[in-house]
Amino acid sequence: MIFLNIISISIRLLLILTLITGILYPIVTTGFAERFFPFRSSGSRVVIQGKIVGSELIAQKFIKDEYFWPRPSAMDYAAGASNASVTNVFLKAKVEERKKFLLEKHSEQTQVPPDLLFASGSGLDPHISPDSALFQINRVAKSRKLTEGQILRLKNIVEESVEKGYIGENRINVLLLNLKLDSEFGIILK
C-alpha cells in the first residue's frame, strides 16, 4: 500500500512540475520578453526595406575586400568550436595560415590583432575589437575608393562602449558597420 501511495505521489508531482516548468514557465517568460523586449526576443533581427538581412547577435561571413571581416569561425559561421587546445598542432597551423593571409591582404600592417586570428568560442561572435577594425580600414577604403577618414568616421559611429561603464571592452558589430558602409557609400555588387 505504501508503495502505491509513493508511486501516486510521484506521478502527481511529475505532472505538476511538468505543467509548471514545461508549459507555464516558458509561456510566462516568452510573453514577458515579447512585451518588454520585443527586438531582443525576436533575435535582434536587422530588417532593411522589409527584408531580414541578419541578426545583431550572430556573425556573418563577409569575404569581399570592400567589407570588414568578422572573427574567424571554427565551424564556418555555425554554432560550435574546434575545441583544440593551445598545444594542438592543427590550431597552430590554422592561426599561422590566417596570419599569413591577413598580412598579405594588409601589406602595410606588421601585426594582426588576436581576435582576427582566433575563432570565437561559439563561432557566432558578431563583434570585433576597435583594433581589428583599424587593421582593416586601409583595405576597405582602397577597395571602395574612399579615404580612411570616411571609413574611420563610420567605425566611430557604430563602436559600442563598455557596458555600464566598466564591463568588457569597446567592440564593433561587423554587420552593422558593413550595413552602414552600404547605406553611406552604396552597396557593392560583384
From Swiss-Prot:
Descriptive protein name: Potassium-transporting ATPase KdpC subunit
Family, per entry: Belongs to the KdpC family.
PANTHER family attached to this UniProt entry: POTASSIUM-TRANSPORTING ATPASE C CHAIN (PTHR30042), POTASSIUM-TRANSPORTING ATPASE KDPC SUBUNIT (PTHR30042:SF2)
Keywords: ATP-binding, Cell inner membrane, Cell membrane, Ion transport, Membrane, Nucleotide-binding, Potassium, Potassium transport, Transmembrane, Transmembrane helix, Transport
GO biological process annotation, one example: potassium ion transmembrane transport
Topology term for the membrane: Single-pass membrane protein
Keyword NADP part of the UniProt annotation: no
Subcellular location: Cell inner membrane
Record gene name: kdpC
Lineage: Bacteria, Pseudomonadati, Spirochaetota, Spirochaetia, Leptospirales
InterPro entries documented for this protein: KdpC
Domain of life: Bacteria
GO terms for cellular component: plasma membrane
Entry's transmembrane regions: 13-33
UniProt GO molecular function: ATP binding; P-type potassium transmembrane transporter activity
Keyword Cell inner membrane found: yes
Pfam assignment, any one: KdpC
Function comment: Part of the high-affinity ATP-driven potassium transport (or Kdp) system, which catalyzes the hydrolysis of ATP coupled with the electrogenic transport of potassium into the cytoplasm. This subunit acts as a catalytic chaperone that increases the ATP-binding affinity of the ATP-hydrolyzing subunit KdpB by the formation of a transient KdpB/KdpC/ATP ternary complex.
Disulphide linkage map: none
Subunit-structure text: The system is composed of three essential subunits: KdpA, KdpB and KdpC.
